[in-house]
Amino acid sequence: MEREFKWMIPDPSEFDPIADSSTVSALVQKKGRLEMEAMYYDTADNLIARCHGGLRLRRENETRVVCLKLAAESGFGGARKAREEYECTAPDIRTGIQNLPAAGAPQDICDCLLQANLIELGLTAFTRFWFLLSYQGCTCELAFDYGKLTRNGRVGPICEMELELKSGSEADFDALAVQLQQEFDLKPQPLSKLARMMRL
């Protein structure tokens, strides 16, 4: 189960003041940068959309990862999302779908996807600056994403901050997210990158 908070950031110049703040810097265990590019897919009858999910093949630097997300739940004014998430490394989308059941994905959905003609919905391309944080009883990743969404020749911006629980206490994770939102006056981003891309 993926659990994350997402906030809008008006301008990438606001990334560093948050990352360098005493609140965040004291928690950092590791940090890095990823160049990401993801193609999103669905079937002609919108199987993934009907499951309130997302299917993508994403390049993370030199690694390719297929990810299936299902059944999102929302809270904290739209900032927090919790959803089923299954992923595996794979060179292409169909190989990834074949391997997703071994990662826990529903076999029936994967079988339907393999039998269908997949349609490319659109593309995201962005740079991610990530920080692995340790806070009380949880470990989480803080990420700043900056780039663009592309669909049918139309382009939209990506400029956002995410906090994703990696392990440990959900209560401590929520407490840290609330602290960050209040301290930096963050505005919730209720829509995923896929949802915003589909609105282009």
Task: Give the location of each predicted region.
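Phosphate-end processing signature that detects enzymes handling 5′-triphosphorylated RNA
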Residues: 1-200
